């Protein structure tokens, strides 16, 4: 099983098991509160689930996040899993690390520096996920119909990054959950947050990698989209730091 995260790609179930034990050692009272699951598939072809989880716990043990602080934290995780024959065989996962370390007492920059130092410096540090990382998978996404909500929302995201967009597809009372446990209310906050990414990068390349969708009786249709963004870090911001000129 390949597991892809911002920290890179691991293979097999042992890294997953080790990571779970490590997390439980640091946060022994951790709870996983399911917020939503968007799934597709059947027993014959297998299933794909995109699940959004709110994790909460108390930092009580020494480990990846340093000495125990006794602080209560919460953060969100989104995982895309392909499953067949009661086994996960492909996974993508992203965790709100910025929210975690801020609540524990670090800034993201401070924590990143500690990680690099612990690994023996930049030249010895782990390779993070990038455009050249392994994306090969036996999983084949289910196609969506023309004119469907899945097509509509992928087009919204493409418009945000590829053209001048007026955000007319967002309701004026829409909410936005953003990394760092940040919450936006209304169209103005949504525009501000998306623009905060667009402003710091040049030579942006945006692509859609996977679309999950779910339409159920008497419920609003839901869509999960995994997308990939590349660009040059060319402008400074309070949220994303000083100009690095790095390809991100």
Predicted regions and their residues:
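C-terminal and inter-domain tail/linker signature
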Residues: 1-247
């Amino acid at each position: 099983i390949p597991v892809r995260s911002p920290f890179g790609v691991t293979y097999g179930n042992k890294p997953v098991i080790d990571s779970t034990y490590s997390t439980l050692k640091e946060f022994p009272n951790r709870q996983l509160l399911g917020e939503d699951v968007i799934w597709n598939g059947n027993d014959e072809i297998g299933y794909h689930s995109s699940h959004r989880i709110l994790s909460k716990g108390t930092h009580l043990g020494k480990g990846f996040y340093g000495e125990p602080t006794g602080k209560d934290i919460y953060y969100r995780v989104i995982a895309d899993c392909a499953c067949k024959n009661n086994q996960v065989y492909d996974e993508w996962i992203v965790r709100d690390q910025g929210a975690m370390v801020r609540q524990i007492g670090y800034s993201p920059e401070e924590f990143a520096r500690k990680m690099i130092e612990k690994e023996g410096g930049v030249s010895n540090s782990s390779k993070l996920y990038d455009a050249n990382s392994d994306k090969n998978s036996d999983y084949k996404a289910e196609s969506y119909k023309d004119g469907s909500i899945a097509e509509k929302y992928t087009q919204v995201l493409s418009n945000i990054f590829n053209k001048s967009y007026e955000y007319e597809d967002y309701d004026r009372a829409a909410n936005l959950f953003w990394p760092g446990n940040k919450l936006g209310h209304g169209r103005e906050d949504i525009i501000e947050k998306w623009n905060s990414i667009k402003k710091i990068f040049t030579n942006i390349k945006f692509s859609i990698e996977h679309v999950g969708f779910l339409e159920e009786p008497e419920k609003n249709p839901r869509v999960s989209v995994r997308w990939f963004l590349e660009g040059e870090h060319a402008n400074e911001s309070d949220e994303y730091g000083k100009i690095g000129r790095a390809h991100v």
